[in-house]
Design a protein with these regions (language model features):
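The Walker A/P-loop phosphate-binding site
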Residues: 1-92
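A conditional alpha-helix N-cap/helix-loop micro-motif detector
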Residues: 10-14, 42, 105-108, 146, ...
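Hydrophobic pocket-lining residues that define ligand/cofactor binding sites across diverse proteins
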Residues: 52, 56, 119, 164
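Conserved inter-motif catalytic segment of the P-loop NTP-binding fold
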Residues: 60-145, 159
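Substrate-engagement module of ASCE P-loop NTPases
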Residues: 148-167
Length: 167
C-alpha cells in the first residue's frame, strides 16, 4: 500500500485555487468540483489534463491524463490553446490525453477498469470524470430510485478507490 508521504500535488494552473487546495490537487485522493452549469468545472478538468503533463518542478506530474466524458464536453481545441500557453506541443499533449465517451452509467463504470488497464501501459497520473453523476441522474429518476442510484454510485466510488490504489 502506498504511504501518505508519497502524496504529490498537481497544480490547477491557478495560484488562487492552488492556495485554496493547500498547494494543488493531491494524488491518491478523489477531488470533486461541483457548481452550477457554466461555473468552470469542465474548464478545470481541461486545465488539469494539461498541467498533469508538466514536469514536477513546474507543478505537474510528468504523466498522462484520462478523461471519462459523460456530457460530450471534451474540446481538443481548448487543450491545444492551453498547451500553447505553457509552451508545449499541442499534438504531443493531446496524445497523452486518453478520452472515453460514456453514454450511460454502466459504460462510465466500465471505463474506470479500462483506465486501470491503460495505466499499465502509460504513466496515468490523473483520471477525470465530467460529470460523475449526470448519467446516474438521467437513468434513476424520481425518489423511488434514489436508494438504487446511491448504491450504484457507491460501487462506482469503490472502483475509483481501486483505481487510485492501482496507479
Amino acid at each position: 500500500e502506498k504511504r501518505r508521504g508519497e502524496v504529490e500535488k498537481l497544480s490547477t494552473g491557478s495560484n488562487g485555487l492552488n492556495e485554496l487546495l493547500g498547494g494543488g490537487i493531491e494524488t491518491q485522493s478523489i477531488t470533486e468540483f461541483y457548481g452550477e452549469f457554466g461555473s468552470g468545472k469542465t474548464q478545470i478538468i481541461h486545465q488539469l489534463l494539461v498541467t498533469v503533463q508538466l514536469p514536477i518542478e513546474e507543478g505537474g506530474l510528468n504523466g498522462h491524463g484520462v478523461l471519462i466524458d459523460t456530457e460530450n464536453t471534451f474540446r481538443p481545441e481548448r487543450i491545444k490553446s492551453m498547451a500553447e500557453g505553457y509552451g508545449l506541443d499541442p499534438k504531443e499533449v493531446l496524445s497523452k490525453i486518453h478520452v472515453g465517451r460514456a453514454y450511460n452509467s454502466d459504460q462510465q463504470m466500465l471505463m474506470v477498469d479500462k483506465a486501470l488497464e491503460l495505466a499499465t501501459k502509460h504513466p496515468v497520473k490523473l483520471l477525470g470524470i465530467d460529470s460523475l453523476t449526470s448519467a446516474f441522474r438521467a437513468e434513476f429518476l424520481g425518489r423511488g430510485t434514489l436508494a438504487e442510484r446511491q448504491q450504484k454510485i457507491r460501487a462506482h466510488m469503490r472502483d475509483l478507490d481501486k483505481f487510485m490504489e492501482g496507479t
